Amino acid sequence: LPMWYAEAGSAVLAPSAYNADFLKTKSELLGMDVALLTEPEVADGKDRKFSPWGWDPALRKRLMTLGAGQTELPSADYMNILREHSHRLQAVKLLPGLRLNEYFCGESFYLSTLAECSAFVEGREACLLKAPLSGSGKGLNWCKGIFTTFISGWCARVAASQGGVVGEPIYNKVEDFAMEFYADGRGRVVFAGYSVFHTGGSGMYAGNDLLSDEKILQKLSAYVPQEEFIRLRTRLEEELSALFGGFYHGYLGVDMMIYRNGEQQDKIHPCVEINLRNNMGIVALEVSRKCLAEDAK
């Protein structure tokens, strides 16, 4: 998978040279300038820049075991900062400032106690509870107005380990989409592209459309005027730079949706989730840019 989005001149880490023939064939066919780095070779180099799908303590420890130097890896303090900023509370806080005008809606609540969780669930016919340190459709609990023993136990466990639970209403979703960004590690976060994706009935990621940014905007502007997406992306560059620009280096994505309200009006939910890591939207962007003809549909 990394070969599809790796920068030219990069190497993809694999367990052994078993993958070399596959990488060579694809590189020649698609013009990719990507080499193979096996796990035993990690210790032979120095001053490498590792760019994983996403950082976590287990990966850091694994690379150290393979011989990567301390200076090539993020510090333990950085890992703690990254975990804090990957928390869904960041999206809850950001959402109100992204409801820019009448085309934007959406609510999200951070619930810190079982009493708050119970009141939220029982105050709605249906709702969705999310574990704060989860993503890609995982850590979700769909509720139907009854705070059952199972839901209570789930909330208690999640709150004890992750600080709380995020509660959201159920939306009449029309389209899932995202805006992808790149943080340069020097304070600036810039727009990288759009993505349209699909999820299953439980919210799990199912796949991405391969489309150019222009065609994605055409698709989305059937629901909301195109200028509103431009307005939102500009605001997000500012907000994300303030939130993450000072420490984070790499790709990130903001999941969104078009939903239809009770008056049959289409609205943008501008911040369903923030993914402070690489994501399949970035892969779809790179595949579209490298492999699709301009008139592909």
Region annotations inferred by a language model:
Residues 107-108, 127-151, 178, 201-220:
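Glycine-rich phosphate-binding loop of ATP-grasp-fold ATP-dependent ligases
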Residues 191, 203-266:
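A long amphipathic alpha-helix within ATP-dependent nucleotide-binding catalytic cores
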Residues 113-125, 158, 244, 255-267:
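A short acidic-Thr-Gly-centered motif at the start of a beta-strand
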Residues 151-206, 257-271, 279:
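Phosphate-binding site of ATP-dependent enzymes
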Residues 111, 121-142, 160-173, 254, ...:
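ATP-grasp fold ATP-binding core
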Residues 10, 277-297:
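Active-site "cap" helix and flanking loop/linker of ATP-utilizing ligase/carboxylase catalytic domains
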Residues 20-27, 59-67, 138-141, 177-178, ...:
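A short acidic (Asp/Glu
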Residues 1, 5, 13-119:
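Conserved N-proximal alpha/beta basic substrate-recognition cap immediately N-terminal to
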